[in-house]
Amino acid sequence: MQVKNPILGLCQKATFALSAAKVEQCPDDQGYEVAFAGRSNAGKSSALNTLTHASLARTSKTPGRTQLLNFFSLDDERRLVDLPGYGYAKVPIPLKQHWQKHLEAYLGSRECLRGVILMMDVRHPMTDFDKMMLDWAKASGMPMHILLTKADKLTHGAGKNTLLKVQSEIRKGWGDGVTIQLFSAPKRLGVEDAYRVLAGWMELEDKPVA
């Protein structure tokens, strides 16, 4: 008997809901939301598009182009949220400050936020932004799952070594509440593991399929 993860079907039907420049423009604060965060060029949009089997999140050759909170509906009560990318040098400082202000407002106010998926480039993990997000997750008690993206850029052995190293650093500095995995959008590596995390946070149980 096979087991079907219901989050898969929902992600494949994901649709764009709205973009918000500030928290007041977000959907009603109810249901389930999972936010996707990451430093600019960490592969956040590619990961979202891979998980939804669509081109919902904008990808760009110029990192840092995501300037809004972008909401994607899975069903009437479940949403994925693409948060602004951070850290790109060519983005003006006032715009960076604007992004940070509204990111902090979103993270600090949304009662329906069930967890954060944090993207780190496996070749350059644990940036200052990543550590800031880990600090926030620890202080707030928010579940966090890390995707070490672009794993296809490293050999299997090098990717595994980086995974173990980052796991150890996070465990020492932030405890055992953060989970982590390797991920590659082009190779679809780690997609099923990411689906299981989403399903757990959104309270969707695996269902047997005859």
Curated annotation (Swiss-Prot):
Molecular function per GO: GTP binding; metal ion binding
Cofactor(s) demanded: Mg(2+)
Gene3D superfamilies: P-loop containing nucleotide triphosphate hydrolases
One cellular component term from this protein's GO annotations in UniProt: cytosol
CDD domains per UniProt: YihA_EngB (cd01876)
UniProt entry keywords in alphabetical sequence: Cell cycle, Cell division, GTP-binding, Magnesium, Metal-binding, Nucleotide-binding, Septation
Binding site for Mg(2+): 45, 66
S-S bonds: none
Start and end residues of each EngB-type G domain: 30-204
Presence of the UniProt keyword Membrane in the record: no
GO annotation, biological process: division septum assembly
Annotated positions binding GTP: 38-45, 64-68, 82-85, 149-152, 182-185
Family of this protein: Belongs to the TRAFAC class TrmE-Era-EngA-EngB-Septin-like GTPase superfamily. EngB GTPase family.
Function text: Necessary for normal cell division and for the maintenance of normal septation.
Protein name: Probable GTP-binding protein EngB
Upper lineage: Bacteria, Pseudomonadati, Pseudomonadota, Gammaproteobacteria, Pseudomonadales
Gene: engB
